[in-house]
């Protein structure tokens, strides 16, 4: 029997600098059609990452198994059948439709899906659930594994799998975001590198798909330089401190190298390193500090818009999304807020899809140590939000556009 996610979706429009951010889906909890809610707890189904394939009209979310009875760790939505607006009915997520093939394993625990320039969907399956008891024994235990699926082919077959060696990480559950670097998009897509962040080890793991080999780098710039705050229920606050978390790739040069921009989750600084250095095992890194975005701008996720040369940041506690043009000096005066809402509770992921659409997601679930306290929180508004806006609209009316001219002030 095929089960479906069922949740209430609403559409709102938020005006920011003349642009509009569409709230396509907002959820209090995710439930599953065909399953009695007595058999599982819907509040444990918290998505942490998303990926969008506009060519195939598919949206993917990752739901890690941090609590028992999470039916699917990767799910998808048909955006033709469920565009998000107008609200005619509740859209239905499905289990990720893939063909494993003989001997292939199902996914155990995924935090982040990523689609590369060759329309391959990548996930890092960390290899174990994050609890004991309950249904934990029904899931196999293994190493963190990178897996790729071909979105261009029927049934989305698995086409690549690589286990991360034990000596490259200290814990399976502290991986952050990752990026896939296809060196030559007009050639063989297997000439690719994957850059995996680890916010506990403050390390960056590099996987060479051609050689099927991985290595890691550590650097002081990967470390947290402050303590982050998550504000909840008025004056109540929670603290957390995490290192390297978000990574985004800039424009390629003639040799196929590009800047890899990165942020620690507990920092407001932005750094980059040339991927030429990352592609060499035991190479020397020469990080570049671009600047500081200013107080209260901590973020765990960022995304690059190649059309407009802009980085976007899903901020963690400010409940807003900001931008910075990479051709400008990085300082607060050269950044801008393109979205702000009290209902945007903890930005967890952000991306620019292949059609130039900016997607952002909040889930109300920061990486604090006292996770049990998070699970017990009550939200007045729907905490899970997936929104989108055309980057052209955002760019045109923000300071991230070098030609932007603010409206004249009216003298009174």
Swiss-Prot record:
Major localisation: secreted
Signal peptide residue numbers: 1-18
Keyword Metal-binding tagged: no
Tissue specificity comment: Salivary gland.
Domain of life: Eukaryota
InterPro entries membership: 6-blade_b-propeller_TolB-like (IPR011042), Royal_jelly/protein_yellow (IPR017996)
Glycosylated residues in this chain: 29
Subcellular location: Secreted
Keywords: Glycoprotein, Secreted, Signal
Any one of the GO CC terms: extracellular region
Role, per record: Probably modulates blood feeding of sand flies on vertebrate species by binding and sequestering different mediators involved in the host response. Binds biogenic amines. Binds serotonin with high affinity. Binds noradrenaline but not adrenaline. Binds dopamine and octopamine. Binds histamine. Inhibits host smooth muscle contraction induced by histamine in bioassay with guinea pig ileum. Immunogenic; elicits antibody production in the host. Functions as a chemoattractant for host neutrophils; likely acts through a G-protein-coupled receptor and effect is dependent on calcium influx.
Family stated for the protein in its record: Belongs to the major royal jelly protein family.
Entry protein name: Yellow-related salivary protein LJM17
Organism: Lutzomyia longipalpis (Sand fly)
Organism taxonomic ancestry: Eukaryota, Metazoa, Ecdysozoa, Arthropoda, Hexapoda
């Amino acid at each position: 029997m095929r089960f479906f996610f069922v949740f209430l979706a609403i559409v709102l429009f938020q005006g920011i600098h003349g642009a509009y951010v569409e709230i396509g889906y907002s959820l209090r909890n995710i439930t599953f059609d065909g399953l009695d809610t007595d058999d599982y707890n819907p509040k444990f189904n918290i998505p942490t990452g998303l990926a969008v394939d506009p060519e195939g009209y598919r949206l993917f979310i990752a739901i890690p198994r941090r609590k028992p009875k999470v039916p699917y760790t990767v799910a998808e939505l048909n955006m033709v059948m469920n565009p998000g607006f107008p609200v005619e009915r509740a859209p239905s997520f499905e289990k990720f439709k893939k063909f494993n093939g003989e001997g292939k394993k199902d996914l155990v625990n995924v935090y982040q899906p990523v689609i590369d320039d060759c329309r391959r969907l990548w996930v890092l399956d960390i290899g174990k659930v994050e609890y004991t008891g309950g249904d934990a024994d029904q899931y196999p235990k293994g190493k963190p594994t990178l897996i790729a699926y071909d979105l261009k082919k029927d049934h989305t077959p698995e086409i690549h799998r690589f286990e991360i060696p034990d000596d490259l990480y200290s814990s399976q559950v502290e991986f952050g975001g990752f990026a896939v670097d296809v060196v030559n998009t007009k050639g063989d897509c297997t000439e690719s590198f994957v850059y995996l962040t680890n916010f506990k080890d403050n390390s960056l793991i590099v996987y060479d798909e051609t050689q099927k080999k991985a290595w890691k780098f550590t650097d002081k710039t990967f470390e947290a330089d402050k303590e982050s705050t998550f504000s909840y229920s008025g004056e109540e606050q929670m603290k957390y401190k995490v290192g390297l978390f978000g990574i985004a790739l800039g424009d390629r040069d003639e040799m196929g190298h590009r800047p890899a921009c990165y942020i620690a989750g507990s920092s407001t600084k932005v750094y980059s390193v040339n991927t030429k250095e990352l592609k060499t095992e035991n190479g020397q890194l020469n990080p570049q500090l671009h600047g500081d975005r200013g107080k209260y701008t901590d973020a765990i996720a960022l995304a690059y818009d190649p059309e407009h040369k802009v980085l976007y940041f899903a901020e963690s506690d400010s409940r807003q999304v900001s931008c910075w043009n990479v051709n400008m000096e990085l300082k607060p005066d050269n950044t801008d807020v393109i979205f702000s809402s009290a209902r945007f509770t903890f930005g967890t992921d952000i991306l620019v899809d292949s059609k130039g659409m900016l997607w952002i997601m909040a889930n109300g679930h920061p990486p604090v140590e006292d996770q049990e306290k998070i699970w017990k929180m009550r939200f007045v508004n729907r905490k899970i939000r997936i929104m989108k806006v055309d980057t052209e609209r955002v760019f045109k009316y923000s300071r991230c556009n070098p030609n932007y001219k603010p409206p004249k002030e009216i003298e009174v």
